[in-house]
Amino acid sequence: MKLFVTGGYGFIGSNFINLASNMGHTVMNIDSVTYAANRDNITMRPNIKNVEIDIVDYNLLEKTMLDFQPDAIIHFAAESHVDNSIENPYVFLNTNIFGTYNLLQASSKLDNNFHYIHISTDEVFGELGEEGFFTEETSYDPKSPYSASKASSDHLVRAWTNTYNFPATIVNCCNNYGPNQHKEKLIPKIITNCFLGNDIPIYGKGENVRDWIFVEDFCKAILLIVQNKSIALNESFCIGANEELTNIDLTKKICEIINNRFSLEHNCLDLIKHVDDRLGHDFRYAIDASKIKNELGWKPENTFEKGILKTIEHYKENL
């Protein structure tokens, strides 16, 4: 298949391209190469082409897409750091909302029978209490500029589907972790600071709960959706691995693994420092992934313990 991928130099996009290209798919990657991108994230193969354009540049986006004539469009490109969205929301609105609009408009001009896969987040649903899970039926209740921008883009896709019979699938996923993630994010920051001996900042008491999935497992779920258009078309899927951890337990677990596996001059647990909580910090996210498991036969292959060891090794080699 011919796959048109946005944000392929980023964390999840690069892992997806490496997986899909290795399986023989032809990939066109477009990326604006922001600070969070890294060209070295992609293992270059003859069936990958990279074009450095911004999805807010409609004319270039349209020309590139129409020249390529993809079978599927997988939209990963997004501004995603919640803290940055609080400081500078405009960038998030521009990329996540208007960039998505441009993709919808450009892909609507394709000649072939394409499939648009919109990658979103569980943060659009707001927060959970101590019980319950997000599902495909959960109402939207975004709490940050980031999640509001992603919720808006989800609604745009649904509007295009309902109004123009646009062939789309929406994916809402829990927190990904694994190789190629920018070091500003929580797990890379914990691992990197452990090896460097730097403080590990934890918001508030660290009691906020997140559901974690190893990025390779998520990418395999996306590829299943691409390969099963007849089932996935005009549907939404919530994807998670049922690996819930409080931020403080996550941090301690990683610190203890590194303490036990590597001879460092310091105890990583001593690096943990509690800082003022983030504005609008949602308490808990957790996903019920029954739909994709039942309809497409997907299941995660990596436990958190297995995935985090691979992740630690990656960041140790790329300090």
Task: Label each region the model flagged.
Residues N59, D71, D83, Y90, ...:
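Residues in well-ordered alpha-helical elements
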Residues M1-N176:
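N-terminal Rossmann-like NAD(P)+-binding domain of SDR-like oxidoreductases, especially those catalyzing
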Residues M44, I53, D57, E130, ...:
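Residue-level signature of the cytosolic catalytic core of signaling kinases
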Residues S152, L156, W160, I190, ...:
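Hydrophobic alpha-helix immediately C-terminal to the catalytic Tyr-X-X-X-Lys motif of short-chain
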